[in-house]
Amino acid sequence: MDLLTVEHLTKTYGTGENAVHALDDVSFSVPRGQFLAIIGPSGSGKSTLLHILGGVDRPTSGHVYMNGEDVYSRSDTALAIFRRREVGLIYQFYNLIPVLNVVENITLPVLMDGRKVNDARLQELLDTLGLRGR
């Protein structure tokens, strides 16, 4: 089974003469264990595609399947859980929450999910990233 399957994905912003077709009938699949690079010039729809794949923005039409499940058949609550547990988006200009320290920024998604922070894993991450003590 493919990890990700995209079928006939379209995304249109606006209507009529002002319509912008960011994605037009995009289809592809990514087998489990494979990597995918999305490249193209500015304005070609890369960010729009990634937002739709990550459950941040809904497509105008088409389907996104993750592990065989249609991402957009989920309720808004289930979609929020999907984003929190299954998706990691790192933006070019990421924004940390300025009133939180490094540990609080790292652990926030885990705590929002109602789970206990694995302190050993947290320390391993801090060491790997060279952020211990910050």
For the regions a language model picked out, list residue spans one by one:
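Helix-to-loop junction immediately C-terminal to a conserved catalytic motif
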Residues: G54
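ABC ATPase NBD coupling module
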Residues: E17-V20, V71-G88
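Short coil-to-helix segment of the ABC ATPase nucleotide-binding domain corresponding to the Q-loop/switch region
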Residues: L100-P109
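The feature captures the beta-strand-to-loop junction immediately N-terminal to the Walker
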Residues: I39-P41
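Conserved ABC transporter NBD signature motif
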Residues: G62-D70
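A short, flexible loop at the N-terminus of ABC-type nucleotide-binding domains that lies
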Residues: M1-L3, T12-D25, D76
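Conserved ABC ATPase "signature" region
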Residues: E69-D70, V117-R134
